[in-house]
């Protein structure tokens, strides 16, 4: 492995591939591959590789990008045409992390390039090797292809994005980009707009009406038949089927006799309704018409399609359609609708009953029979017995005139009802250490005195106390004699 690094030529120039999973640093070989490196750096400075995707991934082989169309067939060259492959004896695809140019079928290069994911000696001499991955960014390359799901062999389902190819060190002093990134973006937008306009004009030209060919032998009849405009909206079987034997060719009969003698056909009629229709049709059919129909062997009943169409068109004669099943269905439907909703008479009766009940409650006179109040020393059973003795009744009609009396004094009474007085509250101030109730004279004597007066008062009190002590010490014999006596 060391011999491989020794044989490789020194690199000059550095670029960064900014991908969706990190940055990959690449050192270039501009001396051994000048055409490829100059083309690669110029396209990078012009912003050609910005926001592309890695459109091809072969595990343990290569990771390819550089095609704006993401199909593997696009790309461009700064030379105006593809340039040839540049091979060198000291550059070989013998490990992963090598940068090479993707060649066309005619062994020429444009803008597509790839990174090797393993040793690929079969590519040596067939593709231009122009760079290698530098430093720890090789781990970013490994992470870039890890866990990628492939479809159609080598296309990632969710392609990895190449945000930018940033030129860190340019090895060519005379290299100048043909245009800036902003100019390239504006040019791409202009080309895209021109392409969209061209496509819209082509579609409009195709939609334009072609000129009729009047030289046909049928004098343009076939041409007119081909140019029929297709109608939009729902179509019936008459529009789609030209010669259908299941469709009726007879016109709809609207005479009164036909309507009177033809029962309507409905798929939703029950057996009971069918019997009613049979009776009504037999009773309303004249005998002459019946005989004539039996002789001819034909029936005057129209096709079901015509019958349904006549039903949708609406009745034309009220008297003639009175015996048909349609009127029967209408009457049954009206009967059902009338029975499904509550009648207004029942609602009025319920409302009047409610009003009468409210009036009885409000007009009932209050009972004047006194009810005994329970005493605190009397039990519950005794209270019930006394209530029965004093006229308490369990009548059902008497509950409306009953008055609830809980007894006792009212909570709010008198003139000061609802008003607070000072006697209702007791103020306890923990900061007040004096006892005003026990020594009211001292409290009253304090009123009107200043701080200096209080100092003189305390001094006088101390002098009186010291004088009493001195007198007590001068006459101990007199105190002893007094105690003996």
From Swiss-Prot:
Stretches assigned to the PPIase cyclophilin-type domain: 11-167
Basic and acidic residues composition-biased segments: 184-204, 236-247, 428-465
EC number: 5.2.1.8
Compositional bias (Acidic residues): 381-398
GO biological process: mRNA processing; protein folding; RNA splicing
InterPro entries, per database record: Cyclophilin-like_dom_sf, Cyclophilin-type_PPIase_CS, Cyclophilin-type_PPIase_dom, Cyclophilin_A-like
CDD domains named in the record: cyclophilin_CeCYP16-like
GO molecular function list: peptidyl-prolyl cis-trans isomerase activity
Biased composition annotated in UniProt, kind: Polar residues: 249-270, 278-292, 315-325, 353-370
Keyword annotations from UniProtKB, A to Z: Cytoplasm, Isomerase, mRNA processing, mRNA splicing, Nucleus, Rotamase, Spliceosome
Record's subunit section: Associated with the spliceosome.
Protein known as: Peptidyl-prolyl isomerase CWC27
Organism of derivation: Mycosarcoma maydis
Lineage: Eukaryota, Fungi, Dikarya, Basidiomycota, Ustilaginomycotina
